[in-house]
Design a protein with these regions (language model features):
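Radical SAM [4Fe-4S] cluster-binding motif and immediate context
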Residues: 1-138, 156
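Intrinsic-disorder/low-complexity, polar/charged segments
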Residues: 51, 105-107, 121, 147, ...
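C-terminal accessory regions of radical SAM enzymes
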Residues: 31, 134, 149-152, 156-167, ...
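Alpha-helix C-terminal capping/termination sites
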Residues: 18, 144-147
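Short, solvent-exposed turn/loop segments enriched in Gly/Ser/Thr/Pro and often Arg
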Residues: 46-51, 78-79, 140-145, 169-178
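A broad, structure-centric signal for solvent-exposed, well-ordered loop/edge residues
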Residues: 14, 50, 89, 118, ...
Length: 231
């Protein structure tokens, strides 16, 4: 819903947002618990906290006193869609880890939109840690205007945030999103590249994702080097 220029969700799933009711979610969790003994799970929702009221209602329903047992779970959202009260409620409802797509230490506003800023990223991580929730930060390397200097800013910012876990990925411009269109227009992607390269999580030399997009100052080998260095 924020039209992040690197995102492929708009083309894959459309723009319609649908919230499941707390009762619907709890029914599924109760079934998993009673049938399979499941007590840990992950909510695969890119922006779990998009609707704050709905999220708070869900946290109330997931509280161990109402659920009848303690469910440990992980989730992900944007840094500009959390606050202290919300994260504390999530912890009480069993949240173990919150993943944030922070993405970059220089171009965060350009690529994510909304109110996602470096300052807000610091607050989101801090609030989660204060609530005793682990954090995972996702970062991108290899945006069209990327240079060794901007990569270093991203690495330094990731170190400053001190997330529990950090993941660095080479930027993947999926066909159909704004980043891809801009890269093709700028000549940073050759249209005759084989489609098998456009696979999220695809790897190249050394287990690093094979670069599709290169920049004026960074070749594919440079992007692989910096991604390894970031880890």
């Amino acid at each position: 819903p924020f039209f992040c220029n690197y995102c492929n969700r708009e083309n894959s799933f459309g723009l319609k947002f649908r919230n499941q009711s707390p009762e619907y979610v709890v029914d599924h969790i109760q079934y998993l618990h009673s049938e399979y003994g499941i007590e840990e799970l992950t909510f695969y929702d890119d922006v779990m906290t998009l609707n704050r009221k709905a999220t708070m209602d869900l946290m109330d329903a997931l509280h161990p006193k109402k659920l009848g047992f303690k469910m440990s779970w992980d989730a992900e959202t944007r840094v500009d869609l959390v606050d202290k009260e919300l994260l504390l409620a999530m912890k009480e409802a069993g949240c173990r880890m919150m993943s944030y797509g922070i993405e970059h230490g220089e171009f965060i506003q350009e690529i994510k939109g909304g109110n996602a800023t470096l300052e807000q990223s610091e607050k989101a991580v801090k609030w989660a840690h204060e609530a005793k929730i682990q954090t995972a930060g996702y970062f991108m390397i290899g945006l069209p205007n990327e240079t060794p200097k901007t990569i270093r800013k991203t690495i330094d910012f990731a170190k400053k945030l001190d997330c529990t876990y950090a993941t660095f990925s080479i930027t993947m411009p999926f066909p159909g999103n704004k980043l891809y269109d801009e890269a093709v227009k700028s000549g940073l992607i050759q249209l005759d590249d084989t489609w098998e390269k456009f696979v999220y999580g695809g790897v190249g030399a050394g287990g690093i994702q094979a670069p599709v997009l290169t920049t004026e100052s960074l070749a594919a080998s440079d992007l692989e080097y910096w991604t390894k260095k970031a880890f």
